[in-house]
């Protein structure tokens, strides 16, 4: 009985970890896209 309750807690922790990882991955992707946009604008601005 104790083992199943520990597994339930572990499962909840893993779901939370998975959600945190997906949020961090999305933030990383958004940050990368914003960096590319800034680089493009700076390149265009400096070549004018």
From Swiss-Prot:
Entry annotated with the keyword Membrane: yes
Pfam families: TUNAR
GO cellular component, one term: endoplasmic reticulum
Membrane-topology annotation of the record: Single-pass membrane protein
Keywords per UniProt: Endoplasmic reticulum, Membrane, Neurogenesis, Transmembrane, Transmembrane helix
Molecular function via GO: ATPase binding
UniProt key word Ribonucleoprotein: no
Residue ranges with Basic and acidic residues bias: 10-20
Region feature (Disordered): 1-20
Annotated localization: Endoplasmic reticulum membrane; Extracellular vesicle membrane
Subunit structure: Interacts with ATPase ATP2A2/SERCA2. Interacts with ATPase ATP2A3/SERCA3; the interaction occurs at low levels in low glucose conditions and is increased by high glucose levels.
Name under which the protein is recorded: Protein TUNAR
């Amino acid at each position: 009985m104790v083992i199943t309750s520990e597994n339930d807690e572990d499962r909840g922790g893993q779901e939370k970890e998975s959600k945190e990882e997906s949020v961090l991955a999305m933030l990383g992707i958004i940050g990368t896209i914003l960096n590319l946009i800034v680089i493009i604008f700076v390149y265009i601005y400096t070549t004018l």
